[in-house]
Amino acid sequence: MSHHRSVTALAAGVAANLALAAVVAGAQAGPSYLAVSGWSAGAVGPSNVRLSATTNGAIPKRADQFINDNVIVGIAWADLGTGTALVATIHPTLGRDSHQRPDSWHLHTVQLAGGATAPNDFCLVSVNSTPTGGIAIQGDSMTINLAASKLPDAGEGPISVGDLDAAVGFTVHGGDAGCVTGLGVRVRT
């Protein structure tokens, strides 16, 4: 089975748990470490990129209570034109899906779409890859060092760092009837 199909199967298998988590998380305000106050993305040499995000609070290196109470928590750098994003996520309640830091922050590329129902902002269509990259967390800053070839693929190869339009903190919630997968993405500010 391909990685893409196994991730889709995993998403379907936890839908009931996600729906319960959505009810719990919907009443919670997002923590300051998910409020992105500044970000950057640029090339580092001919084949590597560096993405960074600064938030309004210290980013925990391990799961805190908010992370444990939500199925997926993350910071995303997104190309809004194609709906693709590189996300740094942490999701101990969902389980392991990465060989790099499976119990802590790790990377995925994802495809997003519109159609989510409030209070969600986007639909999570698919998790496309789990690239390996350097993740540094220092206080309120997260920096990602990655091969440019590992950026999200919008159908014609990886996007460039110049295609990235936004960086945001987010949580993922199940039970969104507006999303084909049932998975809604809520931007946290």
What do the PLM-derived regions correspond to, one by one?
Residues 33-113:
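Surface-exposed, glycine/proline- and aromatic-rich loop segments on solvent-exposed faces
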Residues 2-14:
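Bacterial N-terminal signal peptides that target proteins for export
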Residues 152-189:
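Acidic/polar low-complexity flexible segments
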Residues 103-112, 141, 147-152:
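Short, solvent-exposed, Trp/other aromatic-anchored flexible loops in extracytoplasmic proteins
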Residues 21-31:
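C-terminal region of N-terminal signal peptides and the immediate post-cleavage residues
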